[in-house]
Structure formats: C-alpha cells, structure tokens
Amino acid sequence: MTTEKEMKQIQNEFKERMDEGELLNCMRCGFCLPSCPTYIESGFQETHSPRGRIALMKAVADGMIEPDEDVERSLSLCLGCRACEPVCPSGVKYGQLLEEARDIIHQNKKHSLGERVMRKTAFHELFPHQNRMRSAVSLIGLYQRSGLQTAVRKSGMLRVLPEHLRTMEAVLPDVPKSKDMKHRPRFLPSIGPMKKRVAFFSGCLMDTMFLPTNNATLKLLQLAGCDIVIPPEQACCGALHGHSGEKNTGKELAKQNIAAFEALDVDAVITNAGGCGAFLTEYDHLLKDDPEWSERAAAFVQKLKDFSSVLVELDFHQMDLALETPQVVTYQDSCHLRNVMHTSLEPRQLLKSIKGAEFKEMEKADSCCGSAGIYNIVEVEMSMKILDSKMAAVKATEAILIVTANPGCLLQMKLGIEREGLSGKVRAVHLADLLLEAAGHKTS
C-alpha cells in the first residue's frame, strides 16, 4: 500500500516531470476509445481508456487527486500497445506519458521483498547481461532435453502451477544448444551481388530462446543482397525496463547500444522484433535531456528499420517463394511494429507474395493479442480476455498458420492455440521463419 509520504512525493514528481503540453494536447474527443483493448474488455470503464488515464495523470500533476491505488491500478492495467496513437487527431504521445508516469511511481514506492527480488533478478542481473541470459536459457534447454520435462509432465507436478503458466510451459520453443548460442558470427557476406551493408540488432531473447528466428532473418538478408555486421558489444534493448518503471537502466542500455552501432559504416540497423525495434526507435526521446547522448541517439534512430521493410525495399518479394503445401495464412500485427515503427504493409506484402499461402486478413488484426511484454504474466485475467477475443478472430479466418513478427506475440498466439485445443491443427510462426521456409531453406 502506498503511504501518504510516498503519494506526496509521487505527486510532486508528476508536477515536475510530466509533460504539461503533451497532457493538454488530449482533447478528450474519444477517438482512442474503440482502439483500446482494456477499455473494451473492462466493460467500457473510462479509467481504463487512454483518455481516462491521461485525465488521471493531469489530475495528479495538478494536485486535484492523490496518486492512490486506483490511479496506479489504471496505469498498470494498460497494455502499452499504443493503438491509441495512430488514431489520435492531436498526435498525443500517449506511450511516452505512460512510461514517465510508471517510472515516477516505481521510483517512489516501496515494493514488497518478492517484487524487489524479481525486479533485481530480471531487470538488473539477467536481461542486461547476455552471458547470463544464455546460461538461464540453457537451463531451460537442459530441462527440455534431459528427459526432466517429460518426467515432470507425466508426474502431474505441473498441476501446482496456475493454468496460464502450465499452458506457457507447453508452448515454450525448443531451446538451442548452449554452444550454438555462444558462437555467433560478427560478419556475414551477401549471397549474390551486395546491395546494402547493414548492421543487425540481435536482442537478448531473440538471440537465445529464439535463435533459429535470428538465423533465419540473417539468411533472408543475405539472400536479399545484404552484407551484415553483428557487433558483439550490443546489449538488451531496454524495452522491458522502460515499460516497467526501470527507466534509468533503460537509458544505460540505450547508451551501450548506440556506442556499439554508431561507428559502423552501414546503411541501416535492422531489427526483427517489433517490441525491441519500437524501443530502439525512441532512444532519441529517452536521451533527449542528455547533452552528451541526445544527438548520437537521434543519429542512431534514423538508421533503424524492421527486416520486412528492407526485404521489400530490395525486392525480396519478387523472388520465387512458395509453400510445399497450400495453407490459409493470417497475420497478427505486432502492436509496436505497427503503431511505433509504422510497419504494417510490408509484412503483408511479403506474405501475399508466397505461392500456396492464401492470405486472409483477420478482423482487428491491428488489435493487441494481450502479450505486451510480461503483461500476460502479471495481468493474467485481462490478458486472457484479450487473447480469447483474438483467437475468435483467428478462427473466423479458418487459417492454419498465424504469422507475427515479435517473440511475445508469437508465444501468446501459441498460448491461444493451446487454450483453444488447436495444437496440431494450427501453428504460429515468426514471419522470418516462414519466409525462409518459402524460399526453400531450412531454419537452422
């Protein structure tokens, strides 16, 4: 429970740090309401809408209300999907307001011992250190390959876990071997004439748990005519930190990544995870008040592109792409790829170019799936409501292949498939893996 002293400090910092001009930009028109999943799934509660949350932020900053548990609950229930931003006639940067508010609350509130341990372990000891990430993911691999997973499942021990965690265990990808995660290339030449020289942002989860997808992305870029530089000094993007009130750690990771990429002579910096790419894209905002880093951040941001944009730019979709077996395919937008990186047409263009892939657009493909980083772990009830609505839209397309471009979305869609009893009938894949399959190559 937040104390009076803590609430007073939070209120003072809202007044000092929240962007008054941005808060006032909200005209309360309500254009954002139909795009907000939590507003809809909460039964149209105003406090769970972008407009309502901005009103609460403004009221706290003006001293009209205290930043009590109700305010904190409203802000924590937001997915941060930012679907409200493209439809806002005033161009309110809602995501930036939300992250600032969450950071203020986190920095000034006393957390339970369990939460402090969890945050320190995940945000400070694990994600920023790639060697530790590899070790942690290797333990999951050991669990999967040693026979322990089979024994645990047969014993019924998983029944002690909440249902969503049992299902999550069932949909975890097969983890790569430790040696494959350790030995990563620093340079890969184009296959055929070189058209672009690019750098690749590997990510932390993407280069461990989802390593085959990173390998697929690299192979696609090579086939499209890219020389690829992969700087080993790069780090976690900091997205989970920024979204969870760990802004200072996010800034340090941003500086490490800018330093790793800025000296490279490349045409673009490529990402293949919507959540990572979106946070990288906003490094200029994150470091805008730092005189040493603001210009460097702005220069870095200018080079960022999703891999799908580069593939279309290099006419990869004109290649002979085909599936061995004709399949109905649908696409679930990564919220941050669509709403922050403004990349939605290119993935569809690539999918529609695959022979044997009958593309069917699902209803509200641009609406969040409920993953939202760690939201599906900390806000289970709302996340599953949103997922159930999403799976109803998927089933209406009769697709047997759900494609997305973000690891969190991918796991969430696999979770939805498992919950709906569609395992073995429907599969979820990352766009890069499907494209490599369609190009006649195996994902390694």
Curated annotation (Swiss-Prot):
Domain 4Fe-4S ferredoxin-type: start-end pairs: 14-46, 69-100
Cofactor: [4Fe-4S] cluster
InterPro entries: 4Fe4S_Fe-S-bd (IPR017896), 4Fe4S_Fe_S_CS (IPR017900), Cys_rich_dom (IPR004017), Glc_ox_4Fe-4S (IPR012257), Helical_ferredxn (IPR009051)
Reaction(s) this enzyme catalyzes, per UniProt: glycolate + A = glyoxylate + AH2; (R)-lactate + A = pyruvate + AH2
This protein's GO CC annotations: plasma membrane
EC number in record: 1.1.99.14
Subcellular location per the Swiss-Prot or TrEMBL entry: Cell membrane
Cofactor note: Binds 2 [4Fe-4S] clusters.
Enzyme class: oxidoreductase
Main location: membrane
Domain of life: Bacteria
Listed SUPFAM superfamilies: alpha-helical ferredoxin
Pfam families listed in its UniProt record: CCG, Fer4_8
Binding-site list for [4Fe-4S] cluster 2: C36, C78, C81, C84
Binding site for [4Fe-4S] cluster 1: C26, C29, C32, C88
Keywords: 4Fe-4S, Cell membrane, Electron transport, Iron, Iron-sulfur, Membrane, Metal-binding, Oxidoreductase, Repeat, Transport
Subunit structure comment from the entry: The glycolate oxidase likely consists of several subunits including GlcD and GlcF.
Function description: Component of a complex that catalyzes the oxidation of glycolate to glyoxylate. Is also able to oxidize D-lactate ((R)-lactate). Does not link directly to O(2), and 2,6-dichloroindophenol (DCIP) and phenazine methosulfate (PMS) can act as artificial electron acceptors in vitro, but the physiological molecule that functions as primary electron acceptor during glycolate oxidation is unknown.
UniProt-listed PANTHER family: GLYCOLATE OXIDASE IRON-SULFUR SUBUNIT
Protein name: Probable glycolate oxidase iron-sulfur subunit
Natural source organism: Bacillus subtilis (strain 168)
